[in-house]
Structures are given as C-alpha cells and as structure tokens.
Design a protein with these regions (language model features):
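N-terminal glycine-/serine-/threonine-rich phosphate-binding loop
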Residues: 1-63
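Generic hydrophobic/aromatic pocket-lining and core-packing "Φ" positions
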Residues: 49-52, 103, 133-134
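Polyanion-binding loop/helix "lid" in catalytic or ligand-binding cores
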Residues: 77-86, 117-134, 163-192
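Glycine-rich phosphate/pyrophosphate-binding loops
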Residues: 140-158
Length: 192
C-alpha cells in the first residue's frame, strides 16, 4: 500500500508542477514534427499519440506534421496516423501540404490536423517534414515548434549524463562553437 501511495503522491507532484504550463499554453498552437515513424516501435508511437492527445485535452491546439517512409504511400501513412489519434479519443484528420485556411478551420472545429508534406508536382519521393513544420509554424503563428528525433537530445556535458530539456537559440550557437558535433546535429537543428 505504501508503494501505491508513493505513486499517487508522485503523480500529484508532477501535475502540480505542470499546472503553470497548462495555464500558460491554453489555446496555444503547437506544431509537432516527428519525421519517420520507423524509429518508433508500435508502443512508442502509441505513447506519442497519447501525449499529443494529452496536449489537446489540456487546451493546446496541436498540429502534427510527419514524414513518410520511402516506398510507402504518403496518403495511407497520413490516414494511419490520424486513425491512431482517433483511437485515443480525439478528432483528427489528415491533409496534404500547407493550407493554412484548412488547418485553421480544423483547429477551430476541434480537430487535430495531421499533415504530410507535399510537392506541387508530386515528383519528389521525399520532402523534409522539418521544413514543412517550420513553414506551418510561421504561417499559423504557432507558439511552439517541436521537432522529435530518434536522438536522445543535446547533452550538457561530454560524459553524456544529462541532456537539455529546453534550450535557446543563443545556447545552441554557443554549443556549436564549443563542441564538435556530428553532421546529424546540424541537420536536426536546421544548419545542414
């Protein structure tokens, strides 16, 4: 019974810590880009969908931008992700490309927009979802832009014991000067 009480107290503590953020981000638009789902297991992807639904349930307005694995039909993948969100209890609908009027209508009508990047002539097999997410965030005047990655994060030290959970652009610039980061780092943060 003591373990159960500890767990309840721990969860209550987390909620109390989160309350100011919940209040601050009520009705704020958050664009979430998560690249290809291939680096997520089924369980991890389901947890991600639950986290997105949690953001929605506390009053945020999430917009999901995703990539499509090479060789997969982008519309089928888009529909699959929207369905995963719906299975978590929210309304979600997939669209292709950046149409801010449609995205705004979807948000206003309590839907989570699920967006796959699209090239106008449909000749490109892959369009970087990070660029699409950035474009949507700018055009929708989003309050937050979140890039999810298979990498654990930016380590605070060379021993790789602790990561940044929040980092500013000036801090990133300083780290780039101080450390030798792999090429993937620049690609992830948009310098590549």
């Amino acid at each position: 019974m003591d373990k159960e009480l500890e767990l309840v107290e721990h969860k209550a503590s987390i909620l109390i810590d989160a309350l100011p953020y919940i209040r601050d981000f009520n009705q704020k638009t958050v664009v979430i880009e998560y690249g290809c789902a291939e680096w997520l297991s089924g369980v991890e992807e389901q947890r991600l969908m639950q986290d997105i639904v949690l953001l929605k349930s506390v009053g945020m307005r999430p917009i999901v931008v995703h990539a499509t694995r090479m060789g997969l039909d982008k519309f089928r993948e888009n529909k699959r992700i929207a369905k995963l969100l719906e299975l978590c209890g929210v309304k979600a609908i997939g669209i292709c490309g950046v149409d801010t009027e449609t995205i705004g209508l979807m948000l206003d009508n309590d839907y989570i927009p699920v967006i796959v990047p699209n090239d106008i002539d449909n000749e490109s097999e892959y369009i970087d979802p990070r660029e699409t997410a950035l474009e949507i965030a700018e055009k929708m005047q989003a309050d937050k832009l979140v890039y999810l990655s298979k990498y654990p994060g930016i380590y605070k030290d060379e021993e790789r014991k602790d990561i940044y959970y929040k980092i500013t652009v000036p801090e990133v610039e300083k780290l780039r000067k101080e450390r030798n980061f792999p090429k993937e780092f620049d690609e992830i943060i948009g310098y590549g």
